[in-house]
Amino acid sequence: MLFVPRYMPLLLGFSMAIAACGPAAAAVIATRSYSYFTIKGKTADQLDQQLSSNGPTASGSSARHPGATKIRFGGDATYVQAGGRCRVSSAKVTVHTQIILPRWSNRKGASKQLSMIWDALSSDIKRHEERHAEIARNQARIMERQILALPPQSTCERMQELVTDVSTRGIDEHDRLQARFDRIEAVNFQNRMIRLLNNRMKTSGGER
């Protein structure tokens, strides 16, 4: 079974600035990029070996994987102090995801069966990693809403502490959601691949 874990260096730092009075504003900034690593092979075993030797590593492990998603959080918040109280004026959470996928360089001349298996596997790897990126974006939006909903505090220093606490708890929840997704995906991998292959066989006329 192939596992497709994500690699996630997480960094979230909020800067503090005192702003003029105005309505609270939010702006999640999400960017996504793709990069590829090359594999070669004419058999399923060769491709599997190439994925194991050329794939990206996960954080804290030397093991290589068929795909990965690097995720980096960041952000800042500004505050308004008026009437002896400090509130959040604006918050911006940023999340950058880099999806790393395999690219089969010498596919030409490979058997139709191997090509079909690879198409099913590579599409599943891509879907899996893009879902990791989606989870990160969704969590960034949740964190932003939670920061903007914080009640006014007596000082902006205290408000900064609350913002930091929200961001820390948000990152922890993000990690739990990502780990849960990986566990579910691993359990369902075999059935998912069988379904993908059957669908591709039907599409290509493999069933009579």
Predicted region positions:
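Bacterial N-terminal signal peptides
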Residues: 9-19
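Mid-length scaffold segments of soluble, non-membrane domains
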Residues: 86, 90, 96-143
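Sec-exported extracytoplasmic/periplasmic mature domains
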Residues: 127, 131, 135-148, 152, ...
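Sec/Tat signal peptide C-region and signal peptidase I cleavage site
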Residues: 21-26
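Bacterial N-terminal signal peptides that target proteins for export
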Residues: 1-11
